[in-house]
Structure formats: C-alpha cells, structure tokens
A protein has these predicted regions:
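Extended catalytic cores of very large enzyme megasubunits
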Residues: 1-340
C-alpha cells in the first residue's frame, strides 16, 4: 500500500484559460483520447458526470508526476523548491496540452489516480519480462505474475525455457468452495491455484463466482467497466481442457504459450484492458514455431502473443523465412547483438 502525504496542485487561475482553448488534434486524436485515456470524472468527484476533457487529463497527469517527484524528494531528505516546481510544471502542462510531448499511454491513463498513489505504480509500466526457466519450482506463480501484469495493462514478454522441466499431474479436486474475490488479485489467485493443481498435484476447490460484480458495473480503481465473471470462468475451463488429457506428460513449449495466450484472451475481455505479449522460443523448436499454422486455435487464443525465436548469427534461416513469409511470424531476436 502506497500513500501520498504531500500533494501538488496547479492553481485554478493557471488552468482557467485552457478550459476553452483549442487543442491541436489530428483527424482521430480527440476520438482516440476520449476512447482510451479519458477517465470518468466521478472517480475524483462523486457528484461529477461524464469523462475528462483534455485539459483535465493534462492536469491529472502533471499533478500526479510532480506529486510523485515531491514524495521522492522528501523521502531522500532533499530540498524541495515549490516555486521552481510550479514553473516547471506549468511549462510541462502547456507543452502537453499542445501535444509537444506526451507520456506513454500508461502514463496518460494511470498517472495521478488513486490506484497509483495508494496501491501500486506498476500500472505505469509499459512492459515486463518473465522467464519460465524456474517453472519446475515456481509453477503457477509465473503465470499468475504474467496475468497480474497484463491486467494492469503491462505488455509481457516470456520465454519457453520451462519446457520439459515438470510433469503434468492430476489435481486433488476437493469439495471445498473458494468464493473468488471481486478484485484483480482474486482473479489472479484463482488461476494460480488451478495451475498449481496441474503442475504440483495441489488441491483445487470448487470455484464460486458469485462475488464478482456483474458485467457493465464500474471499476473504481483501475478504471473501466466489469466484464462480469464469464471470461474468468471460461479461462478456468480452457486451462482444464488444455491440461486434463496431458497428465503424466512433460509440459511443452506449446503448453506454456497456450497457457499465457488463454490468460491474455481472458484479460482482453476487460473493456479498457489490453493484452500485449511476446513469446520467445528456441530456433529449432518446430512445434512452437508452427503454432500459428493452426487456424482454429489461432482465432481462439493464439493471437494473444507475437511469437519470436532466439536467432543465432550465421544459422540457416531458410525454413524460418518461409514460415515468416506465410503468416508474418516468427520474429527474429538476436540476443547476442541485443546484449552488446
């Protein structure tokens, strides 16, 4: 839990001229802004209606940025010059209003919200990466981590290094009931529990979805509207379908990617949430590299990641190039070059 104890505000006198000032939008700029980055005003004032206009989003972003900076300065025991900060903030506001700069999309959506100030700043991250090489002992936690990040709007990269490191097991299905909490954490925990059942033979209770708010209900923290419990229930069912006939078999790279893609399919159902993922496999793993040749699974969930492979300088690319020519993937990542 994070708590801001020091606020930063731009004055009403400064903001007033911008309320009626024309914004230099392009043909689709305003529509895109209102669709993707404009938050409901009742998040900040229970009596307000409608959603932010650009001047209000700029206010939220700039005040959030400087409040975060102010907290950091005081945390380090440094000197805070409010007059200097106000001058810089006003210049930043004017430049943002006139589209001379913008923060990342995550910043436009999340900066200055109670979610970032009181819960986690992870919602500001653009991307993250998680290796599956320690899948044999971390199990479902790895995919829970990915799901949590995706639900925060973070793009997630992952690899297939965990392939062959564990054997799928029969879960211990119990008659206990788990009422899934109506929160991001509740959804993630249920998936973690189910996957550990198949990865470690752990106990899996019956899931009760009754506490999850109905479709269309407002989400006050992250923003947007609820998709209801249907996408989560479908994810549980899809994961069971994926693993139930593989008990006794080693987990494959395809299983790893399918699991993440099914999670991404669930996350994308959540209105304002996006699901961007990048998978990286071995250059000689044909089953992985041909995953998107299956149209039925591609349209169901395998669209959920861009699939690339670890390319080796000097290798024969003929087969891979033919695959890329056919469907645009796989992508090529030269890690040796990226690290230098």
């Amino acid at each position: 839990m994070r708590t801001h104890i020091r606020r930063f505000r731009l004055s009403d006198t400064f903001l007033e001229p911008y309320k009626a000032k024309e914004v230099p939008w392009g043909p689709l700029g305003y529509v895109t802004f209102k669709r993707t980055y404009s938050r409901r005003l009742n998040e900040f004032d229970p009596e307000a209606t409608g959603s932010e206009e650009w001047w209000q989003t700029c206010k939220r972003v700039i005040e959030g940025m400087f409040a975060m900076q102010k907290d950091h300065v005081f945390l380090l025991g440094l000197e805070w010059n409010d007059a200097k900060a106000q001058r810089t903030a006003k210049e930043a506001y004017d430049r943002l209003f006139n589209l001379k700069w913008t923060p990342p999309g995550r910043g436009l959506w999340m900066m200055g919200t109670k979610f970032v100030e009181e819960k986690t700043a992870a919602g500001l991250f653009n991307c993250a990466f998680r290796s599956t090489k320690d899948l044999s002992h971390k199990g479902g936690y790895l995919f829970a981590w990915m799901m949590d990040a995706l639900m925060l709007g973070i793009g997630v990269g992952f690899d297939t290094e965990g392939a062959g490191t564990l054997t799928i097991k029969e879960p211990q299905h119990t008659n206990d009931t788990l009422v899934i909490d109506d929160s991001r954490e509740g959804w993630v925990d249920s998936v973690h529990l189910l996957l550990d059942g198949y990865f470690f033979g752990g106990k899996v209770p019956k899931f009760d979805y009754s506490a999850i708010r109905p479709a269309g209900a407002l989400i006050s923290g992250f923003g947007g509207t609820s998709s209801g419990h249907a996408p989560l229930k479908e994810l549980h069912e899809n994961l069971v379908k994926l693993f139930k006939d593989k008990v006794g078999e080693a987990i494959t790279s395809v299983d790893i990617v399918d699991t993440e893609n099914l999670i991404g399919r669930c996350v994308v159902s959540g209105n304002v949430r996006r699901s961007a993922a990048l998978a990286m496999g071995r250059h000689d793993d044909r089953l992985y590299l041909e995953m998107k040749n299956d149209d039925e699974k591609l349209y169901h969930h395998r669209w959920g990641s861009n699939n690339s492979f670890h390319a080796v300088v000097g290798m024969d690319y003929e087969w891979h190039a033919a695959q890329s020519q056919a469907n645009g993937e796989p992508g090529y990542i030269w890690l040796d070059n990226a690290r230098t």
